[in-house]
Amino acid sequence: MAKTKAAAAKSEQKICVEGARVHNLKNVDVEIPRNSLTVITGLSGSGKSSLAFDTIYAEGQRRYIETFSAYARNFLGNMERPDVDKITGLSPVISIEQKTTNKNPRSTVGTTTEIYDFLRLLYARTAEAYSYISGEKMVRYTEEQIIGLLLSEYLGKRIILLAPLVKNRKGHYKELFENIRRKGYLYARIDGEMQEIVPEMKLDRYRNHSIEVVIDRLQVQDKDDKRLVQSVAIAMKQGEGEMLVCEMDTNEVRHYSKHLMCPTSGISYRDPAPHDFSFNSPQGACPRCKGLGFVHIIDRNKVIPDPTLSLKDGGFAPLGKAKQAMIFWQVEAVLEEYGCSIDTPLGEVPDEAIDEILEGSPERLRIPADKSKTTNDVYTEFGGLVKYIEQMRDADVGVAAQRWAEQFSGICECPECKSQRLRKESLHFLLDGKNIAEVSALELDQLYEWLEGLDKRISKRQQAIAAEITKEIKTRLKFLLDVGLDYLSLSRPSMSLSGGESQRIRLATQIGSQLVGVLYILDEPSIGLHQRDNIKLIRSLKALRDAGNTVLVVEHDREMMENADYIVDIGPLAGRRGGEVVFQGTYKEMLKKDTLTSKYLKGELSIDPPAEYRKGSGLSLTIRGASGHNLKNIDVEIPLGKLICITGVSGSGKSSLISETLYPILSKHFYRSLAEPLPYRAIEGLENIDKVIDVDQSPLGRTPRSNPATYTDVFTDIRKLFVELPEARIRGYKPGRFSFNVKGGRCETCGGNGYRTIEMNFLPDVFVPCEECRGKRYNRETLEVRFRGKSIADVLDMTINQAVEFFQNQPTILNKIKVLQEVGLGYIKLGQPSNTLSGGESQRVKLAAELARKDTGRTLYILDEPTTGLHFEDIRVLLEVLGKLVNKGNTIIVIEHNPDIIRSADWIIEMGPGGGHRGGEILYCGVPKESLLA
């Protein structure tokens, strides 16, 4: 009995997975020590994510959801049980993936980490209010204080006490005046002038008015003046806590309020609450931009993209070519007013005429009867093209119309809040001379320093209130600084973060939550990190482990493996030839084994730098004066015909320079893209390249119907081959017959999916093979057409390696699929759904498609972090592929920290020296140096 208990206790020290068969896993058994830092490594496509996320995490989440009632599960959705025999010792599990899922423009680093919530509380409780009109500090008074001030300032003087009822609002206020008369008041100060309130009195309803009722006229006597005390009380009640005093001899007016009030202008603020500092709350958001910080405006350059065209030829892009319609007649009428016609190129039309066409005509336009097909001339008002487009954009006329209008829109800074997102009242609450938007815009390390010294710069009352709040903010900030995110700010939009940054923010949030006994699963957290920042990350993961948690990391980073307590190596290769546990144990034990990973770690296999760096074409592309984000007005020369690596610490400006400045410039030039580049002065050398291609790791398509065969276009050639077969020709089949996306050849029972979805109310949806086609996707007649004994469905089910052998005598098809084999994807199937491919696999499919194309050798390729998800061996294959593209005369720019990529590049551009405001400079340009790898 004692032995059984001891064995059970020992097994509880491990997470045991038995018989895992998800995706390509081959009935694997794995033991992961609890309270350890464990790394799962292996080739791309070997089954790492299948084990970590699709087995362990999926089972943990499924068990959690099982704890809810059947009724609750109906709304939450149920997770399918992973294909595994048994998992024991499983703790509550939290997955921290590298996907940037938040596309909400309202989400920021501050809202995601909840630090901004504490900052809002700090400002609501300790900030001091200032007037947005006079800049003076706001004051508030009790009735006793007001009486004291009146006795000291107006003693012996004649004054009028007024209660404000209306402040700068439109209306005729007839009912208000009647109500005032019924209360016995006979005079009011209306728009600055004293007037008697007469029966049936009303004002111009379309003008703004200010109305203050006269409560009393009196001469201020000594401190026992009971009339003064009584009148002040009535004025404060009628004015809802506010009153005005007008000195009768000078007409000078002063404001008094029990609320926050400007003593000069009289404006008042309500008492601040945390929601007044939230740009996601109606109480705090800027009324113009609704808290977004930007507004949409119509871009004239998009409305008139080519000034050499006339109205007749479609010079105004929203209108297209001239046709019989009222808006064309209106534009033509404006042109004729200025002596132009529908044939005049818009570049030759006077600016005044263009302004009138865009902004609207001040006078009614005459449309001749012969055009409008009426008996008399028509006189019409013309609001302008800008108003026309805005109406289409803002009206509820359907998505297509709104998209049409948005193509002529641009985004610009909100003119009211200057991108600070909050209403002006909220922006005039200051703490240590800064408003909350200015504090949110500080980089995180600067914010930490500001909070550190805040105690010395605020009053004792503020210190007492702020102590606990600032302590909590600093604790959370420290976690963000520890994972190398010191260059971010709380105001940074979440949608602008890279996958690695998003993941590290979530990691810091989890460390801050101080949970214990949790299993954390992370997907390559070292992405986007310079070697310097990687040490901070490892330290944070160890802190998570030391707090009593189990940390499971899918990773290829050598340094991470060296610091791990336990390593699980999945292999031996990828796809069908992977899915096995080739090693599990400590790092030292791994070095004694003979796996592909251990050979790289021991140095038996390595990625050697080229013996000679490419000389390139001698031509270059130069950006001058790049100054977006933290770029410091830099000039960068990019030599063409080389493999170029852009490196530097996180936040140094690499993506700002390449992805947000260079790529949009080139995309706009070659493809008329609407994406606006960050500010720059000039670009030189555009004539030296023909096109630009951004090869990222996003999925090949949006649906499972997309696959490597369709993406590389080899499926078109395969369908053409099947159409030429005798059986297909006899039956009169066309290429569409062999597509599973259109009616005709596909199985209509499952719509060409190969499976049917059965909805289960209280259980997850079940996917069962289609009983009609048995998962083949096509109908029986289509499958009867065979090439060398194989149907179109059999071909799609082949791996790339099998397809290369099968199509040996079909050069058109062979050339395209051979490239997929060369980039190391021989194990995937031709028809494998794109949503089952990893990011690294998707990127290599895209590279293969590029390699297969006939190109001019003058293409510029941009790859951001291409080693994401790649093993040492995958990186070696990737470098071979990139080398082939460069050897054709193309140029490749890679944003990367991986030492093997840096060593293998022909040219290095290092940015820094730090992140954020300390970055944005070019530190080094030239061939790789060992100093860069330190």
What name fits each language-model region?
Residues 1-934:
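Conserved phosphate-binding elements of NTP-dependent enzyme cores
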